[in-house]
Amino acid sequence: IIVLSIIAFCFPPTFSWATNYTSLLLGIAMFGMGLTIKLDDFKIVFTRPKELLIGCFAQFTIMPLVAFCLAKAFHLSPDLAIGVILVGCCPGGTASNVITYIADGDTALSVGMTIFSTLLAPFITPILVYLLGGSWVEVSLLAMILSVVKVVLLPVLGGVLIYQLFPNFVEKIRDILPLISVVAIVLLISGIVGSNAAKIVACGAIVFVVVVLHNICGLLLGLSFAKIFNLNYKKATAVAIEVGMQNSGLAISLA
């Protein structure tokens, strides 16, 4: 992602075409995610509801509020402010599951949080953006809800349904599903970087500073929040990473 984003920044036409397919690319990524979800993954609701509720609550409170505070503290322009808030109000990204695994965190909890924060996103994300971003730009609540349903909820549920109907076929291609989702997200992000290269230059270092602070605050506050409820290292690590890593692809699609 970093390498191709740099290429897109230096040579904008290389990936700028991808912006014409923003919703499609995100839909492909979400559909790929749905294909990897088994019904057993939903058992965490009944077997570990405490950790799941703690994680999802932290997800939809810490990052949105940190985004709002950063936008106010740095006196961001309306465009930048709503962009930061959009990212903050989105659910966790699937990359958090990989990072949690590498960090020796509770991968099952991370996957559960990603699934359920994604399923909650069509209802919670638009409301949060409406409440926190309304002071900068006019936000159409209904239009945003419909957008999230279209590019997130329907593709994910479609993927889950296909897996249940054709499990043997899906298992055969299971190893390449993450690659398909990654390619879609990389093209999506690279396209946005390429088409907004001039704006990124104009904004200067402030964008970099705000993004870094947003992620660091999310990780640290997520970890602290988990520790308040006496979650062990593995569970606290999963919560911290899930809170600190957002589904930026969804934010791009909604922007």
Task: Go through the PLM ranges and name each one.
Residues 1-255:
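Alpha-helical transmembrane segments of multi-pass small-molecule/ion transporters
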